[in-house]
Every structure is written in C-alpha cells, then in structure tokens.
Amino acid sequence: ITDQSFNQTTWEAVQAYAQENGKTYAYYKPAGDSTAERVAKIEQAISQGAKVIVMPGFAFAESVYECQDEYPEVKFIALDVSQADVEGCFYVDPYAPEPELIDPNNEPHISPNVVCVVFQEEEAGYLAGYAAVKDGYTRLGFCGGMAVPAVQRFGSGFIQGADAAASEMNVE
C-alpha cells in the first residue's frame, strides 16, 4: 500500500507491530466500496484465522455494526470510526426527529470486542498551518484528498493555525 495516506500508515503500523511481536498478519482489500464487500473481506479474514481486524476509515462503521455481535471472539479496531458512527447504524434514519430502530429488539451498542478510535485531525492541521507560516510560507492553500470529515477537520485546523501564526507575525 503506497497511497501515502491513512491506509498506508495503518498497514505499516500493523506490519511493525506484528513483526515485533511474532504475530502473523495479512492485508485484505474489499473488491469495491460497499458495506457488503467490506463485510465479505472481514469474514474472509476471520475464516483464515484473524483474531484482530484493523479497519481504517469511517466507511467501516456499518461493517462493525454488522460483525461485532456475530464474531464476539474477534477484536475489531475501527480507526476514524466513532461510537456514534456505529450506533447510528442501528437506525433506519439516525437523523430523523424520532429515529426508528431497524430491529426493535437490538438497542444501539458497542460490543466489548470493538474499539473505536478517533483522532483530532484539526490539531495536527493547526500545527501544520502554523509551522508553514512560521517557516516563511505566506501564500498557502489546502487541497484534501477527499471531502470527508477527517480531511475537513484537518483543513479547518490548517487554516486556523496559519491564521494564528500570521497574526503573531503581522503577516497578511
């Protein structure tokens, strides 16, 4: 994986941890961009002996929702997936004034085998923007890879950090 982004960093971390701790590891890439295709790869990993599955990206929320109770012996680490993201999957429309559960007998929950990890991308973005201006760059722009919440938070932080440094230095 060489996308120089979240996927690559996650994969490199999994490899490093597994190698340092004598663990086996494998990479499974969904064939497409649907929950069904992500779940199929999760199930393939489990059938091949995976005990811990690391999933990078908010798009895995529904996959966690679908797999967490079905595979209680497997640990799921969902990066950039909040508990609210997973719990929202229990509803037909989580944003409705009175959300209706898909299954009235299944209340929203995060199973003990799930760890949701979210980052404060805006803080890293702030530091990047601040450092750019402090290093003398005063004509800046920000282009994120995709218009997704994590990238938007980073971009917002970048702008705020650049503005703060420019204010300190009296630079426009």
Each language-model region and where it sits:
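A residue-level marker of the well-folded mature domains of exported/periplasmic proteins
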Residues: 1-172
